[in-house]
């Protein structure tokens, strides 16, 4: 169905998005700007204009991304960025097999996705908490243990938000700082059921040393720009990859392959790569987000491989357990 043929439909969708999406998508958050129905309606109108513009570019490109109404359409871009894009960029060393750890020279299949191995947990929703950095790191730990043959468990993101030092909880953080904290302190991540997500900062809850949990043995952190085949080999060898991207245009993403409208060197959002697909004319990374399953492609984004789109290869981490 072409929504352009139904001029009233966008306004109905706005009402649904404004109160809908995932059940927890409107968790408590105190904005620094005044909120009102009038402001949200103005933001929605701006979103419609932005969608038309984005969709008018590169119309002949195969499988290009398409943009439209979703749960973020009632936010102005500056509001969206202030709430959701809170990952702090870090400078990663450029990967070199001669200097750094050697990645096995495995043969790359045309398609691979760790979800097919049943070692990736379900998409979560960070709500109005800028904790993407914690969600991506915890997701990688969950998968690393499952790949080793352990049961797939939802681990506590809230524990990382509350306890990780050199980070700011729901006000933003660094994946590198979180990984350093997990590794240096040999923190045992507990299950989400023991330390559930609250979508806000809280006091760190400590567990005894004898309490069962999931710790890491180490991690790697490299810049794989211009080396995305090596990055894919790391994915196959070590498990899902924690990456930091420029996700400003992801506010409007509905599906297709993201090839434009973002840049390298502007990292602001942490996500988890679970696989890749090279079977079509435009190869792409399969990227798990933390904005709920109603966003994008069932909570995932597809990002073009080979061109460092959105800076996806600039800041890449693997976790070892």
UniProtKB/Swiss-Prot annotation:
UniProt GO BP: proteolysis; proteolysis involved in protein catabolic process
GO molecular function list: cysteine-type endopeptidase activity
Recorded catalytic activity of this chain's protein: The recombinant human enzyme hydrolyzes synthetic endopeptidase substrates including Z-Phe-Arg-NHMec and Z-Arg-Arg-NHMec
Glycosylated residue positions: 62, 105
Signal peptide: 1-23
Active site: 132, 269, 289
Propeptide residues according to the Swiss-Prot or TrEMBL record: 24-107
Expression across tissues: Expressed in all tissues examined. High levels seen in the ovary, kidney and placenta while low levels seen in thymus and skeletal muscle.
Disulfide bonds: 129-170, 163-204, 262-310
One Pfam entry name: Peptidase_C1
EC number(s) recorded for this UniProt protein: 3.4.22.42
Localisation per UniProt entry: Lysosome
Keyword DNA damage attached: no
Entry GO CC: extracellular space; lysosome
Keywords: Disulfide bond, Glycoprotein, Hydrolase, Lysosome, Protease, Signal, Thiol protease, Zymogen
CDD domains: Peptidase_C1A
Enzyme class, first EC level, given as a word: hydrolase
Role: Proteolytic enzyme possibly involved in normal cellular protein degradation and turnover.
Similarity comment: Belongs to the peptidase C1 family.
PANTHER family documented for this protein: CYSTEINE PROTEASE FAMILY C1-RELATED (PTHR12411)
Name used for this protein in its record: Cathepsin O
């Amino acid at each position: 169905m072409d929504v352009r043929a139904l001029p009233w439909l966008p306004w109905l969708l706005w009402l649904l998005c404004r109160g809908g999406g995932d059940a927890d998508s409107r968790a408590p958050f105190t904005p620094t700007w005044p909120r009102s129905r009038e402001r949200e309606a103005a933001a929605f109108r701006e979103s419609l204009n932005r969608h038309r513009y984005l969709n008018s570019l590169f119309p002949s490109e195969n499988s290009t991304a398409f943009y439209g109404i979703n749960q973020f359409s009632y936010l102005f871009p500056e509001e969206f960025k202030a709430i959701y894009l809170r990952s702090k960029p870090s400078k990663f060393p450029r990967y070199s097999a001669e200097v750094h750890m050697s990645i096995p020279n495995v043969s790359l299949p045309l398609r691979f996705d760790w979800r097919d191995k049943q070692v990736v947990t379900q998409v979560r929703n960070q709500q109005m908490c800028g904790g993407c950095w914690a969600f991506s790191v915890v997701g990688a730990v969950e998968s690393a243990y499952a790949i080793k043959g352990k049961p797939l468990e939802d681990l506590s993101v809230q524990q990382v938000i509350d306890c990780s030092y050199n980070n700011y909880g729901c006000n933003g953080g660094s994946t590198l700082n979180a990984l350093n904290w997990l590794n240096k302190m040999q923190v045992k991540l507990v299950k989400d059921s023991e330390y559930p997500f609250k979508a806000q900062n809280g006091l760190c809850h400590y567990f005894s040393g004898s309490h069962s949990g999931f710790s890491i043995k180490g991690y790697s952190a490299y810049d794989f720009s211009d080396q995305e085949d090596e990055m894919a080999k790391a994915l196959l060898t070590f498990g899902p990859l924690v990456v930091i991207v420029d996700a400003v245009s992801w506010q409007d993403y509905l599906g297709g392959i993201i090839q434009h409208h973002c840049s390298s060197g502007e990292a602001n959002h942490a996500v988890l790569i679970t696989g890749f697909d090279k079977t079509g004319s435009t190869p792409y990374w399969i990227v798990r987000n933390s904005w709920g399953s109603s966003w994008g492609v069932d909570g995932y984004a597809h990002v073009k491989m080979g061109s460092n789109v959105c800076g996806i290869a600039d800041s890449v981490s693997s976790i070892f357990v």
